[in-house]
Amino acid sequence: MTDKKLYISDVTLRDGSHAIRHQYSVPQVRAIARALDAAGVDSIEVAHGDGLAGSSFNYGFGAHTDVEWIAAVAESVQRAAVATLLLPGIGTVHDLREAYAAGARVVRVATHCTEADTARQHIETARSMGMNVAGFLMMSHMIPPDRLAGQAKLMESYGAHCVYVVDSGGALTMDGVRARFRAFKDVLDPKTETGMHAHHNLSLGVANSIVAVEEGCDRIDASLAGMGAGAGNAPLEVFIAAAERMGWHHGCDLYQLMDAADDIVRPLQDRPVRVDRETLALGYAGVYSSFLRHAESAAGKYGLKTVDILVELGRRRMVGGQEDMIVDVALDLQRSGGAKSREAA
């Protein structure tokens, strides 16, 4: 780690949306954005939890449109860049243009870790619009580091300024993070930045982010009070405190972040964002973190244990976008009388 300035990317208003079933009100969005802007983060990501156009029967309907949320952030900040997320196959280039018109200037184009080729049109279009573009390789734990690096190289070739290791399942350990960033370094142009998006399902969100920085990572995703899918993301205030202890240049006011986490964000959680039996199962089984609330609903409806549904989803290697399979798995378990196996995938 050099004296370079870390790019701090807050995801409270996008990934954090999963934790409250995409029900942020516009006043809540404004309050969180103002607090983050005052605390010095570099960008604030905002959208439905599943990205632009994610509001749907499959993923859950949002309280507002993406454009309304993006405009609320853009109107509330003085210095932070407004970011958003797009998953090809859910969001379209049309949605991207609407987001830009509402104030978004950074976009993260997210694909499953083996499907970077689906991002080409969206990355190229975003670049042509003058946006800062990051490639986002979700479920990065599911393939070896060299294959992940090959996918990162594709995103770079389409024009991504930055490519992320995205631990959507919160299943990576520190060694796994280190190996992936070293593989990225072997193939990416030195001018291409790298980023880390951690989840806290094994309580390793901050540790994994620290390892990423030690391996040269430029951008760190985090959220206030860890607000995010599953056990949440790396808690922003905790990561900044650790970075401060390590003497890293982050540009954020720790005390303002601590206040925002406890006074604004934590009271919004209708289900505590924490490591517990269910969220630990996500990390243990390597399951997409946003499956949590859907699996809990299915467990309640069909008289099952959420953990059993999650572990079976991991055994079947289900990935983001296959939320409809949660009910299928629940019905299979109900017919078979419960858990098939609690061995991790």
Curated annotation (Swiss-Prot):
UniProt KW Manganese keyword: yes
Entry annotated with the keyword Transmembrane: no
Enzyme class (EC, first level): lyase
Q: Which PROSITE patterns match?
A: PYR_CT
Instruction: Write down the EC number.
Output: 4.1.3.39
Chain positions of site Transition state stabilizer:
R14
A family per Pfam: DmpG_comm
Report the record's Gene Ontology biological process terms.
catabolic process; L-leucine biosynthetic process
- Which catalysed reactions does the entry list for this protein? (S)-4-hydroxy-2-oxopentanoate = acetaldehyde + pyruvate
An example Gene Ontology molecular-function term: 4-hydroxy-2-oxovalerate aldolase activity
Protein keywords = Aromatic hydrocarbons catabolism, Lyase, Manganese, Metal-binding, Plasmid
What residues bind Mn(2+), as annotated?
D15, H197, H199
Record SUPFAM superfamilies = Aldolase, post-HMGL domain-like
Q: Which residues belong to any copy of the Pyruvate carboxyltransferase domain?
A: 6-258
Active site residues per record: H18
The UniProt annotation places substrate binding at R14, D15, S168, H197, Y288
**Family (UniProt):** Belongs to the 4-hydroxy-2-oxovalerate aldolase family.
| NCBIfam families per record | 4OH_2_O_val_ald (TIGR03217), PRK08195.1 (NF006049)
Q: Please give the PANTHER family that the UniProt record associates with this protein.
A: 2-ISOPROPYLMALATE SYNTHASE 1, CHLOROPLASTIC-RELATED, HOMOCITRATE SYNTHASE-RELATED
Instruction: Report what the protein is called.
Output: 4-hydroxy-2-oxovalerate aldolase 2
Organism per entry: Cupriavidus metallidurans (strain ATCC 43123 / DSM 2839 / NBRC 102507 / CH34) (Ralstonia metallidurans)
Traced from the root, the source organism's taxonomic lineage reads: Bacteria, Pseudomonadati, Pseudomonadota, Betaproteobacteria, Burkholderiales
